[in-house]
Design a protein with these regions (language model features):
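Active-site pocket-lining/capping segments in soluble small-molecule metabolic enzymes
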Residues: 1-143, 147, 153-296
Length: 296
């Protein structure tokens, strides 16, 4: 049976959630779909110079985080997708220490944008694998193909607007299909032309550099992320899409975004993508829901 591998958000940011969820996932397999598993969990601690995509907010200890991943056989990934790195940034002690820990663990990866960082990590930490970040905004199919041809990347995350270019995607050779990692639940406006500028603003912020704050001009931007809105996005990939379309076509890797969101919403992602509908209430009860919980 072909298995869908999910790549989940919040390695550091949602450590406490995963401390509750992963034992449940292991001890009650009957609650969860048997056609999918957890391929990796990605994220970055707060104040990481090499960080990108989102400003990291995780405060959990790296040793605790990596011990949890090791206990459950899950690949940890560092989100180091800053697109504005310069040579002097490669000496950053904290980011190097994190990479060293992953390198020693043997199954860790780094999500990145910068070729400068890629070359440095290849030379310095040979046990790491690399993921080409969606922050590259690969909206052109020839650009995606060129990225898939790069041997240094184990996975490539295309822009979500290529998710349903099914005829072109299906024509890829299987070796390239194995590398595609679809971003499933993006809520960003499908017609956005500022996505690259948005990511660059985050990169500047992580470097501590001055710059104009990016202002999102998308319709309904003030409403923030809503999963219900993401489900209406033309680029959305849902459970039925994965089972009926992507797995039969030979695609197995699916990324769930959400590092900057609250843990309650991330739990909803875990329920939707991993959990059988009839068991979702049981998972909520195990994680947080009891008969004395008040909302108001």
């Amino acid at each position: 049976m072909t298995i869908a591998h999910y790549h989940l958000p919040g390695l550091f940011e949602f450590y406490e959630l995963y401390c509750r969820f992963l034992p449940l996932y292991r001890n009650h397999p009957e609650y969860f779909y048997d056609w999918c598993d957890i391929g990796s969990i990605y994220g970055a601690p707060a104040d990481c110079l090499w960080g990108g995509g989102r400003v990291g907010s995780g405060e959990a200890s790296a040793r605790d985080v990596l011990a949890l991943m090791r206990d459950y056989g899950i690949s940890p990934r560092l989100t180091f997708s800053n697109s504005l790195l310069r040579a002097e940034h490669l000496r950053d002690a904290r980011c190097n220490a994190l990479c060293r820990m992953l390198n020693d663990g043997g199954n860790g990866g780094v999500i990145l944008h910068s070729d400068l960082l890629l070359r440095y990590l290849q030379k310095t930490y040979p046990n790491l694998y690399f993921v080409s970040s969606t922050t590259k905004v690969l909206t052109s199919f020839p650009d995606l193909q060129a990225e898939l041809e790069r041997a240094e990347f184990r996975y490539v995350v295309p822009d979500f607007r290529l998710n349903h270019a099914l005829e072109k995607l299906n024509a890829l050779p299987q070796g390239q299909k194995d590398k595609v990692e679809f971003l499933c639940n993006e809520c960003c406006y499908f017609g956005c032309r500022d996505r690259r500028a948005c990511y660059e603003a985050v990169s500047r912020k992580n470097l501590g550099e001055d710059g104009d704050e990016h202002r999102c001009h998308a319709p309904d931007a003030a409403g923030g992320y809503r999963f219900s809105k993401a489900m209406e996005n033309p680029g959305f990939i849902g459970v039925a899409d994965i089972q009926r379309t992507y797995l039969p076509m030979g695609f197995e890797n699916f990324k769930i975004e959400g590092r900057e969101l609250g843990s309650a919403l991330v739990l909803e992602f875990l329920l939707y993508y991993l959990t059988k509908p009839e068991c979702q209430l049981k998972v909520r009860e195990e994680i947080y829901l009891d008969n004395m919980l008040d909302l108001f």
